[in-house]
């Protein structure tokens, strides 16, 4: 029995004899298949003290263990490893042949000592049915030959697959696992099953480097990575959902193994970021669903199925998590030395001061729910650090900060509920809650009225015949109501968290139907006291074991029979009878439990009596004294105590408590109440309900769990399973300690021996004829178009020299031994790779040729299109240039005419003003002469005329000199004009040469275009004519431009002259007015007409000096203006205009003089 295992064996020497596999030579014949290992090690007995006599050198060449035989066996089993030797196989042949062979060949055996222990020894002699054995320390024993168990040769020590063992028996398997465990090789294959031994320490078998090695298949040693890699490859190749089923007892390492498998899948299918969220669900689920037990510091107290969805390219697209049967009773009750769920201790240790004040948190030792077990910490675990990791994970799965605070508030409320105490108020033991800190804190945290909380914990409303009766609760009833509320809050919180995680990991539209499911469910449990939780857990393990048996044994052998192949039947232990004990209706354990749960007067004792009454005839059931009964599970007998069975199965939460949660202001309790009401929509009809009880639920816990298991098995049945059996090496969770008795018991429960047997004698790989022919038919050298799939398949096998004993041809399928299909797959992959390379070369050549042709055509087309486009653009630009030139010339002409007219008008005004001044002066002279000239004498007249004549002569000389200067200036200007003309002719020459070059280029482009487009010969002449027209237009454009420049310069000069003249005239008028006013003012001051504090004579001298200075400056500016006007006149009107201006200036000067 599992719960009676107390072994602490250090080696197989001290192992009891009753720990034997079903296939040991005492109860069955010996398996004799030899699989040659890749390498070997020497073995010093089971406990390292006994050594082989003579070693390998003493082995005869005729022995099946000789080097020659081993090498021959290895050569004959390439790709599979199964070399079948002619040792005892039939049921009639016992150990007589082995004894005879042993007497001749000196082999080692496992011997069963009189005290029941196993020890390694060597046969010294045989006599009849007895043999003399030499064991460790030279002890000689005489034993029966039939009790001897042959030991494997030293070369097979530590093989990575148990199928490679020559002799498959209990001590051989156990020793091989221990050998590998001591070298940190914790993974061993047992056919299709991976055996994982928990090392209880860090081992260097994980990380990105190892992931990459298994991804590239450069490392073929057994590993969880290899199982996950096989699952994802088969999912993509076969388009069938996969499942990885991890089983083992509590503490065997199932949760860590599931996390390792998820890490590999995330590494291979990562890229979208969702894989990081999937990995971060582990800290959350472990914190809220795992706890420390006596057997495991991180025991999963719930089962979970993680279904990871993949896209068509093998990338993770989402995930979904389903949980089973959370152990709610652990919230309110813990055994000595155990802990409640990790999250409670993490919250107390890692909450920030702000959060601690908000939740009114204290240390874990202050809460009744946590201190009852006197265990607050785990060695090597920092709860505060884990709490921060949980908060980080909640952020990653998109749980908001507000929701996180609400979650922590619910946890604190559960802890404070445990501290709520009651006071007895009457003689009938009725109670009411004490109004202390605990009660007020709970009301504050869940957001309810404190009075309503008091009523919910101390009273119960009952409906009987449409009447409501208020029932006061006793102390025990109140405590049960308090604990039920705490358990319900925590269970609903756990379900709510799982729901939030699933929303974050939702696949949505990315779902493709391909998935890999990882099942991590509680292992088989057997304690000194087993309750309802162990009852359900072990029932689940029975169901999983049935699935394991069905897949590896039943379906396998049924398929062999249906397809009519030759095979050897392997017996295995079927647990169908135990499953029927649980599930049979109406007299099964679950049915009777539900029936008793519906009775209001049902008790745990009446349940036990009912079970004994109806199930005593079942071979898997035994009734014990009192409330106990025993069930013979596949892993051993377990005795259950029915105490608490009915209460836990009913899982009652009174409607008053649900109403309390729905009235809370916090949204989480409201959500919890809604989920409970939905669950209670269809009440269970029974005597309790008819009697008016307010408690009702749709299904009992056991029935609901049974339904979940059936759905789980249905989902797993639609997948290709991959099994991992986790083994716990010791009960003290210590690294390096290997308790062989405990390991042996677990190996029996896992059925490892039977798995290896059926794998060695069976054909694990099978394929339909048509699929095999379609997959490998192209490898045949001959034409197979007209052949049927079976003929094609046989031809493929013959072509690749597959040995007949390595495959079987069935009615519809081909069956292969392990490794044979791998040879064909390697050949197929190499051939496909060669085909792909050849195709890539040919397609590359075709693509390059097409690209070259395409480039040539594109170049011709581009040249034509660009030429046509440039011609259109040139024509358009030419038209725009001509139009703009015409507009510019018209505008400039208009501007010049307007400026010239303004200049002429201004000149006329100036001339009229000056001439008027001259006329006025002359009129004054004439008047003076007419009035006083008669009185002068002739001599004065002569003097006046002489002076006037001399003045005229001087003016003539000055005019001639100025004329000469102007002629010299004109000569200089003519020279400059000549230089400008020369430069302009050079520019014209250059422009003409550039035009000729451009015309030549145009002609060359036109000739190239005519060669490329021979069909456009008619358009060539038009293009040539266009070119000539364009050239003439360019010439016109140049001439027009020069004309525009000259006209523009001339008009600009005229404008400057007019502005200067207008300024001079304006200044003359202003200065004359100013000087006249000043002179008149000073004369009035001097004559006394005006009084002023100044010296008139000094001011007159000063004014005269200022006048002379201005006159000198003004004269200079007049001369400059003259020169400018003279130049303009010479350019516009020639010599006549110049003479007119000279005469005009002469008159002006004579007038001034």
From Swiss-Prot:
IQ domain span: 831-860, 854-883, 903-932
List of residues binding ATP: 248-255, 296-304
Coiled coil: 948-996
Region (Disordered): 1020-1050
Disulfide bonds, paired cysteine numbers: none
Biased composition (Polar residues): 1024-1033
GO function terms (MF aspect): actin binding; ATP binding; calmodulin binding; cytoskeletal motor activity
GO biological process, one term: actin filament-based movement
Domain Myosin motor residues, every copy: 157-829
Protein keywords: Actin-binding, ATP-binding, Calmodulin-binding, Coiled coil, Motor protein, Myosin, Nucleotide-binding, Repeat
CDD domains named among the record's database cross-references: MYSc_Myo8
Myosin N-terminal SH3-like domain segment(s): 104-153
Source domain of life: Eukaryota
GO terms under cellular component: cytosol; myosin complex; plasmodesma
Record region (Actin-binding): 581-615, 709-731
Alphabetical list of PROSITE patterns matching this protein: IQ, MYOSIN_MOTOR, SH3_LIKE
Assembly mode: Homodimer.
Protein family (similarity comment): Belongs to the TRAFAC class myosin-kinesin ATPase superfamily. Myosin family. Plant myosin class VIII subfamily.
Domain text: IQ domain mediates interaction with calmodulin.
Function: Myosin heavy chain that is required for the cell cycle-regulated transport of various organelles and proteins for their segregation. Functions by binding with its tail domain to receptor proteins on organelles and exerting force with its N-terminal motor domain against actin filaments, thereby transporting its cargo along polarized actin cables.
Protein's recorded name: Myosin-3
This protein's encoding gene: VIII-A
């Amino acid at each position: 029995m599992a719960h009676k295992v107390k072994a602490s064996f250090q080696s197989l020497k001290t192992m009891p004899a009753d720990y034997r596999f079903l296939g040991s030579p005492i109860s069955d014949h010996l398996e004799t298949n030899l699989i040659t290992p890749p390498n070997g090690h020497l073995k010093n007995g089971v406990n390292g003290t006994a050594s082989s006599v003579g070693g390998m050198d003493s082995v005869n060449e005729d022995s099946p263990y000789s080097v020659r035989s081993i090498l021959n066996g290895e050569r004959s089993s390439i790709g599979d490893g199964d070399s079948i030797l002619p040792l005892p196989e039939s049921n009639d042949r016992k150990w007589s042949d082995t004894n005879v062979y042993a007497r001749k060949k000196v082999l080692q055996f496992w011997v069963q000592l009189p005290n029941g222990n196993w020890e390694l020894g060597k046969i010294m002699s045989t006599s009849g049915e007895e043999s003399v054995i030499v064991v460790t320390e030279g002890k000689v024993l005489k034993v029966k030959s039939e009790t001897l168990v042959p030991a494997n040769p030293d070369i097979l020590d530590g093989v990575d697959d148990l199928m490679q063992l020559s002799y498959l028996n209990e001590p051989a398997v156990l020793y091989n696992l221990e050998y590998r465990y001591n070298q940190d090789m914790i993974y061993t294959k047992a056919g299709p099953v991976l055996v994982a031994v928990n090392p209880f320490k860090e081992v260097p078998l994980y990380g990105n480097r190892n992931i990459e090695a298994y991804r590239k298949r450069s490392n073929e040693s057994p590993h969880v990575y290899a199982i996950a890699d096989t699952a994802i490859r088969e999912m993509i190749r076969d388009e069938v959902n996969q499942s990885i089923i991890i089983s083992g007892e509590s503490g065997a390492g199932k949760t860590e193994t599931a996390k390792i498998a998820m890490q590999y899948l995330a590494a291979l299918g990562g890229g979208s970021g969702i894989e990081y969220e999937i990995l971060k669900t582990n800290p959350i689920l472990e914190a809220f669903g795992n706890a420390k037990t006596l057997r495991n510091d991180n025991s999963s107290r719930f089962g979970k199925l993680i279904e990871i969805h993949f896209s068509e390219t093998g990338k993770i697209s989402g995930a979904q998590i389903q949980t089973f049967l959370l152990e709610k009773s652990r919230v309110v009750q813990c055994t000595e030395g155990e802990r409640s769920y990790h999250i409670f201790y993490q919250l107390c240790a890692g909450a920030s001061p702000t959060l601690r004040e908000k939740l009114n948190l204290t240390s874990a030792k202050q809460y009744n729910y946590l201190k009852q077990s006197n265990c607050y910490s785990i060695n090597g675990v920092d709860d505060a650090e884990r709490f921060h990791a949980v908060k980080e994970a909640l952020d990653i799965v998109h749980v908001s900060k507000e929701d996180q605070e609400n979650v922590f508030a619910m946890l604190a409320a559960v802890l404070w509920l445990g501290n709520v105490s009651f006071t007895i108020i009457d003689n009938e033991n009725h109670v009411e809650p004490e109004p202390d800190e605990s009660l007020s804190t709970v009301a504050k945290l869940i957001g309810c009225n404190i009075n309503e909380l008091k009523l919910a914990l101390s009273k119960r409303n009952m409906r009987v015949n449409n009447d409501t009766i208020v029932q006061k609760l006793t102390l025990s009833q109140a405590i049960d109501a308090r604990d039920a509320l705490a358990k319900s809050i925590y269970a609903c919180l756990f379900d709510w968290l799982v729901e939030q995680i699933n929303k974050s990991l939702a696949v949505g539209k990315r779902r493709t139907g391909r998935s890999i499911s990882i099942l991590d469910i509680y292992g088989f449990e057997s304690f000194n006291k087993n309750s309802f939780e162990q009852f359900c857990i072990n029932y689940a393990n029975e169901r999983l074991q049935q699935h394991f048996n069905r897949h590896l044994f039943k379906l396998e052998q049924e398929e062999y029979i249906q397809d009519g192949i030759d095979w050897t039947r392997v017996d295995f232990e079927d647990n169908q009878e135990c499953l029927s004990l649980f599930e049979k209706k109406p007299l099964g354990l679950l049915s009777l439990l539900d029936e008793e749960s519906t009775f209001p007067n049902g008790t745990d004792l009446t349940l036990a009596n009912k079970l004994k009454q109806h199930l005593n005839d079942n071979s898997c059931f035994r009734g014990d004294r009192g409330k106990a009964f025993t069930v013979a599970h596949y892993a051993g007998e377990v005795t259950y105590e029915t105490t608490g069975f009915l209460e836990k199965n009913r899982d009652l939460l009174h409607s008053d408590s649900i109403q309390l949660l729905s009235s809370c202001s916090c949204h989480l309790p409201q959500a919890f109440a809604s989920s409970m009401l939905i669950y209670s929509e269809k009440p269970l009809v029974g005597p309790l309900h008819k009697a008016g009880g307010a408690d009702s639920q749709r299904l009992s816990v056991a029935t609901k769990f049974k339904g979940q298991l059936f759905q789980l098995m249905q989902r797993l049945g639609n997948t290709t399973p991959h099994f991992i059996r986790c083994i716990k090496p010791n009960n003290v969770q210590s690294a390096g300690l290997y308790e062989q008795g405990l390991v042996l018991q677990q190996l029996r429960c896992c059925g490892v021996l039977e798995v290896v047997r059926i794998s060695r004698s069976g054909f694990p790989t099978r394929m339909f004829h048509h699929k095999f022919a379609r997959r490998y038919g192209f490898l045949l050298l001959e034409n197979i178009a007209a052949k049927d799939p079976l003929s094609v398949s046989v031809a493929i096998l013959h072509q690749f020299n597959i040995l007949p004993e390595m495959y079987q041809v069935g009615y519809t399928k081909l069956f292969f031994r392990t490794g044979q299909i791998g040879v064909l797959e390697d050949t197929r992959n190499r051939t496909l790779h060669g085909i792909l390379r050849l195709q890539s070369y040919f397609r590359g050549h075709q693509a390059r040729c097409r690209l070259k042709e395409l480039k040539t055509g594109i170049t011709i087309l581009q040249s034509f299109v660009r030429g046509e486009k440039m011609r259109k653009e040139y024509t358009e630009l030419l038209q725009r240039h001509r139009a703009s030139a015409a507009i510019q010339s018209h505008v400039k002409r208009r501007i010049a005419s307007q400026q010239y007219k303004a200049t002429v008008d201004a000149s006329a005004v100036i001339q009229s003003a000056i001439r008027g001044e001259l006329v006025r002066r002359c009129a004054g002279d004439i008047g003076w002469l007419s009035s006083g000239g008669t009185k002068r004498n002739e001599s004065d007249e002569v003097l006046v005329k002489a002076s006037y004549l001399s003045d005229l002569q001087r003016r003539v000389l000055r005019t001639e000199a100025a004329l000469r200067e102007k002629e010299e200036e004109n000569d200089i200007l003519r020279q400059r004009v000549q230089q400008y003309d020369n430069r302009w002719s050079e520019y014209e020459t250059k422009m003409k040469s550039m035009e000729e070059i451009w015309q030549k280029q145009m002609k060359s482009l036109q000739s190239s275009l005519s060669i490329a487009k021979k069909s456009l010969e008619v358009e060539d002449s038009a293009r040539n004519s266009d070119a000539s027209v364009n050239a003439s237009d360019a010439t016109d454009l140049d001439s027009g431009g020069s004309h525009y420049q000259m006209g523009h310069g001339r008009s600009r000069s005229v404008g400057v002259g007019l502005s200067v003249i207008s300024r001079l005239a304006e200044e003359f008028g202003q200065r004359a007015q100013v000087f006249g006013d000043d002179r008149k003012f000073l004369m009035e001051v001097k004559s006394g007409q005006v009084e002023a504090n100044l010296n008139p004579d000094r001011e007159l001298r000063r004014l005269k000096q200022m006048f002379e200075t201005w006159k000198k400056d003004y004269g200079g500016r007049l001369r400059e203006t003259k020169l400018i006007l003279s130049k303009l006149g010479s350019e516009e009107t020639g010599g006549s205009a110049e003479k007119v201006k000279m005469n005009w200036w002469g008159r002006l000067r004579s007038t001034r003089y």
